[in-house]
């Protein structure tokens, strides 16, 4: 069902090509150009068609959030504008002639696109302020364990006795007896864990569990790192971003339903991934992150 108002996203063809070239090259620089005509879904769409559809959704969402930001009076400071100008200059200076020939974009178009992207980011930050987005260390906790899997309880009891002996080498026991070649595992805490998760997070550093029965197997666990600091920090950041995205979705989705934004019907007509040989630029977003990483 269409919303009350519809608007066409105000992108230049050069800006469309910046996004298209960036996303095309992120894949093509790794997998070569042969992937574009590969069937990518059950409907028979090619990888190029699927990627263009994904880019289309991104561009619509970006334009919608930018429209929200302008209606809410979200403005850029002079310092932010200066940073975005420097960013645009660095990005543009890094483009080769082949990049420019394929994208056909001017530096001021790059600057306007970066401003739009930054304003959308700023909108998300301002609209989610005051909401509880905190993620505790306990909530994000990641641990490392070693596990031995046995097929019968009798075998598990025998191996557990060996594992509990003073000076026992748990890893060697696992290599000798476990029916699962995967000895080491990282585990993430969650509110709904299975029996293995519950047993693992109950262990202190270097402690060995009892026998844990799950999915037809019998497990013995050893905690080798009760707090993986680096992995926990990475997960904490990811969970916080997920909370922020979820909080903003509650604001964005009702707005988007009432303020429909569409791309021009001919947006992709002149975007051909088979052209632009020699165009390899793929750092539009990564360069932005290097300037404005939290």
Where are these regions (language model features)?
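A general structural motif at alpha-helix termini
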Residues: 20, 85-88, 174-178, 239
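Surface-exposed patches in mature extracellular/periplasmic domains of secreted proteins
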Residues: 72-81, 170-174, 209-212
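N-terminal targeting/tethering segments
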Residues: 1-103
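Soluble non-cytosolic domains of exported or imported proteins
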Residues: 46-63, 75-82, 109-118, 150-154, ...
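Sec/Tat-exported extracytoplasmic proteins
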Residues: 27, 59, 63-76, 88, ...
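Peptidyl-prolyl cis-trans isomerase
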Residues: 159-196, 225, 229-230
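PPIase-associated folding chaperone regions across multiple families
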Residues: 99-158, 192-294
């Amino acid at each position: 069902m269409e919303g009350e108002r519809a608007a066409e996203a105000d992108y230049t063809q050069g800006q469309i090509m910046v996004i298209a070239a960036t996303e095309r090259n992120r894949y093509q620089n790794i997998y070569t150009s042969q992937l574009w005509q590969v069937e990518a879904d059950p409907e028979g769409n090619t990888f190029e068609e699927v990627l263009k559809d994904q880019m289309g959704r991104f561009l619509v969402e970006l334009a919608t959030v930018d429209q929200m930001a302008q209606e809410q009076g979200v403005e850029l400071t002079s310092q932010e504008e200066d940073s975005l100008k420097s960013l645009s200059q660095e990005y543009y200076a890094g483009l080769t002639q082949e990049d420019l020939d394929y994208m056909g974009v001017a530096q001021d178009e790059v600057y306007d696109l970066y401003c739009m992207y930054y304003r959308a980011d700023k909108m998300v930050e301002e609209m989610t302020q005051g909401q509880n987005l905190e993620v505790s260390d306990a909530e994000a906790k990641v641990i490392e364990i070693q596990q031995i899997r046995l097929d019968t309880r009798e075998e598990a009891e025998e191996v557990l006795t060996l594992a509990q002996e003073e000076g026992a080498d748990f890893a060697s026991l696992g290599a000798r007896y476990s029916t699962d070649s995967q000895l080491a595992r990282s585990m993430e805490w969650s509110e709904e864990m299975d029996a293995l998760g519950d047993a693992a997070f109950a262990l202190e550093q270097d402690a060995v569990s009892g026998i844990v029965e799950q999915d037809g197997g019998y497990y013995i666990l050893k905690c080798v790192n009760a707090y993986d600091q680096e992995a926990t920090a990475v997960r904490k950041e990811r969970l916080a971003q997920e909370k922020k995205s979820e909080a903003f979705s509650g604001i964005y989705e009702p707005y988007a339903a009432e303020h429909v934004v569409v791309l021009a019907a001919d947006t992709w007509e002149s975007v051909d991934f088979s052209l632009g040989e020699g165009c390899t630029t793929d750092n539009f977003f990564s360069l932005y992150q290097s300037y404005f990483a939290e």
